[in-house]
Amino acid sequence: MSLLTEVETPTRNGWECKCSDSSDPLVIAASIIGILHLILWILDRLFFKCIYRRIKYGLKRGPSTEGVPESMREEYRQEQQSAVDVDDGHFVNIELE
């Protein structure tokens, strides 16, 4: 005798909801909220880097330079670059023998 014939399989009635008041509006609302929460949680986990980067830095890439003369813009760029160069010099190279 095969093992497959001795395994009990659930009947169609076994999968049905046993709640007598499943048509209650509160149960339906809770189910919808639960499904929406699950969908939002999955989207959050998939795109959390993009979402929180937008919140942290906003849509702009930097301060607005509208109405600022070109010479001041160039000076600002040089200051930013020198600040980056200083940060690069902060690291120490250690050589092991």
Swiss-Prot record:
The chain crosses the membrane at residues 23-43. GO terms for molecular function: monoatomic ion channel activity; proton transmembrane transporter activity. Residues 1-22 are virion surface. One of its GO terms (cellular component) is membrane. The modification Phosphoserine is found at S64, S82. It is found in: Virion membrane; Host apical cell membrane. Keywords: Disulfide bond, Host cell membrane, Host membrane, Host-virus interaction, Hydrogen ion transport, Inhibition of host autophagy by virus, Ion channel, Ion transport, Lipoprotein, Membrane, Palmitate, Phosphoprotein, Signal-anchor, Transmembrane, Transmembrane helix, Transport, Viral ion channel, Virion. Forms a proton-selective ion channel that is necessary for the efficient release of the viral genome during virus entry. After attaching to the cell surface, the virion enters the cell by endocytosis. Acidification of the endosome triggers M2 ion channel activity. Homotetramer; composed of two disulfide-linked dimers held together by non-covalent interactions. May interact with matrix protein 1. Belongs to the influenza viruses matrix protein M2 family. When the channel is activated, one or more imidazole moieties of His-37 probably become bi-protonated. This is Matrix protein 2. It comes from Influenza A virus (strain A/Turkey/Minnesota/501/1978 H6N8).
